[in-house]
């Protein structure tokens, strides 16, 4: 929920947020083939564009639990596709947020947290 609060607004409760990231938070739709919502479990992350992801490759698996997600924007530093592309992580200046749970994402999550401490 922390990353979503730093976005412009959210469909969840039709809420204005802090506006640090230029992204709108929308309910996951599930795409052409209905997908299970909430999105719970392991999924890949790609388009890694930050030192936060040093040492990780494209299509690294991370753990998600969510029904809403930030749309991709110019602050997107990682993305995931679950019935459509959404921001898996956002970064701007010294602000970072992740949609996935690094604390539940095993070694990859540990690496991300260690990288964060080095920024």
Where are these regions (language model features)?
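Short linear Ser/Thr-Pro motifs
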Residues: 8-10, 67, 105
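Residue-level signature for short turns and capping positions that connect secondary-structure elements
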Residues: 25, 33, 83, 102-103
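A short, polar/proline- and glycine-enriched secondary-structure boundary/capping micro-motif
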Residues: 38-41, 46, 87-89, 107-112
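Acyltransferase
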Residues: 98-119
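Cysteine-nucleophile active-site neighborhood
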Residues: 1-39, 114
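Active-site oxyanion/phosphate-handling segment shared across diverse enzymes
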Residues: 44-102
